[in-house]
From Swiss-Prot:
The lineage of its organism: Bacteria, Pseudomonadati, Pseudomonadota, Gammaproteobacteria, Enterobacterales. This is Exodeoxyribonuclease 7 large subunit. It comes from Salmonella typhi. One of its GO terms (molecular function) is nucleic acid binding. Keywords: Cytoplasm, Exonuclease, Hydrolase, Nuclease. InterPro entries: Exonuc_VII_L, Exonuc_VII_lsu_C, OB-fold_nuc-bd_dom. Heterooligomer composed of large and small subunits.
Length: 449
């Protein structure tokens, strides 16, 4: 029988080790409530004490790196709440508790409730960023849910008056401490949403102990803040005070004064921004006007270069040059003919062939007559062509058209308006008349039938 059980035989060391591992792995970290006794603190700085109740007790140790975070000095007979790991001291086989944190029993229980509610609401998604509403920018009316006699309200109103005196503020007075406070805070949030007067709410109070701030760790308050259609800024206590309301709110402010800073505009800064914007707008307008003026000058010069009067003047100059060339050519031919006549006359006078001279003279006279008639005909033809060209240019000249009562309209970028689809109501157009320009705005566009 002994041989069949040898595989189950433990040494003392193995037994203690196995029990320690089971305790640490199965139990993990637990909260323990009890009364302190036999408290000692040796030179090492560690704490050793016993936790007991009416029927049992357990040895506890709290090492120096943990106990220095405790904010009070434990006393014999004091009721405390300890967060600890369960283990076994193997050399002696003593079962003991290794404490990680310690709180007075009343505050400790509240902290435990706080952690439980925080975990519950977090699991439900009430803290998720996707549910956070953006704050209005700027706010047109601020609602404040707090005590009407507390310092928090005074701080909020002082900051709002300094930063934006014209910003309307509606106060929803409520208790912020005591058994009735959570219900009043919930009703104030619901009332603000029902009345719809504000576009942002500040919910908060001044600093205090965990018990003082407990109304803002109430589940009813948390769910009312989450359900609010109006964005909520939580402002509970000081920067180190963190409540459930802070996690559920759309934004957490470290203090009531900071909440007022967040929801209000700084009028001086706003004035500087407006002045800066005006300056930038003025510079942009100056640049735009200078650019349009430069563009107008360029177009004006181009139009001047294409003006019908300039084109007519250039053609008149060309025609005058042609007339001069024709005159020079005529004079040259007459001179040549005269010289030939003189040479012929000289030869004839030397040979004295009188009949031949008469024929030649007659021929010369005919040539002179034909040449003169030809020149006159050419000049008359050129004058007629010139007159026709002038008449044609005057007929197609925009100035002549304008003189008959017509106008030419262009868009702001210089395009000539030919169809109504080139403009719409509200557009600006420029119209050229015979004696100047006018600028007008299109009121309506009606297609032709």
């Amino acid at each position: 029988m002994l041989s069949s059980q040898t595989s189950s035989i433990f040494t003392v060391s193995r037994l203690n080790q196995t029990v320690r591992l089971l305790l640490e792995q199965e139990m993990g970290q637990v909260w323990i409530s009890g009364e302190i006794s036999n408290f000692t603190q040796p030179a090492s700085g560690h704490w050793y004490f016993t936790l007991k109740d009416d029927t049992a007790q357990v040895r506890c140790a709290m090492f120096r790196n943990s106990n220095r975070r405790v904010t009070f000095r434990p006393q014999h007979g004091q009721q405390v709440l300890v967060r600890a790991n369960i283990t076994l001291y193997e050399p002696r086989g003593d079962y003991q508790i290794i404490a990680e944190s310690m709180q007075p029993a009343g505050e400790g229980l509240l902290q435990q409730k706080y952690e439980q509610l925080k975990a519950k609401l977090h699991a439900e998604g009430l803290f998720d960023q996707q549910h956070k509403q953006p704050l209005p920018s700027p706010a047109h009316c601020v609602g404040v849910i707090t005590s009407k006699t507390g310092a928090a309200l005074h701080d909020i109103l002082h900051v709002l008056k300094r930063r934006d005196p014209s910003l309307p503020v509606i106060i929803y007075p409520t208790a912020v401490q005591g058994d009735d406070a959570p219900g009043q805070i919930v009703r104030a949030i619901e009332l603000a949403n029902t009345r719809g007067e504000c576009d942002v709410l500040i919910v908060g109070r001044g600093g205090g102990s965990l018990e003082d701030l407990w109304s803002f760790n109430d589940e009813r308050v948390a769910r009312a803040i989450f359900a609010s259609r109006i964005p909520v800024v939580s402002a509970v206590g000081h920067e180190t005070d963190v409540t459930i309301a802070d996690f559920v709110a759309d934004l957490r402010a470290p203090t009531p004064s900071a909440a007022a800073e967040i929801v209000s505009r700084n009028q001086q800064e706003l004035l500087r921004q407006i002045q800066s914007a005006q300056q930038r707008l003025g510079m942009a307008m100056d640049y735009y006007l200078a650019n349009r003026s430069r563009r107008f000058t360029q177009i004006f010069h181009r139009l001047q270069q294409q003006h019908p009067q300039l084109r007519l003047a250039r053609q008149q100059t060309a025609l005058e040059r042609l007339r001069q060339r024709m005159g020079f050519a005529l004079e040259a031919r007459i001179k040549q003919a005269t010289q030939r006549q003189q040479r012929v006359s000289q030869r004839l006078s030397q040979q004295n062939p009188q009949p031949r001279i008469h024929r030649v003279q007659s021929r010369i006279q005919q040539l002179e007559y034909r040449l003169t008639e030809n020149i006159r005909s050419r000049l008359s033809e050129q004058r007629e062509r010139f007159g026709n060209a002038v008449t044609h240019l005057e007929a197609v000249s925009p100035l002549a058209t304008l003189a008959r009562g017509y106008t030419v309209s262009t868009t702001t970028d210089g395009k000539v308006l030919k169809k109504i689809k080139q403009v719409k109501a509200g557009d600006i157009m420029t119209t050229r008349l015979e004696d100047g320009w006018l600028e007008s705005e299109v009121k309506s566009v009606t297609p032709g039938t």
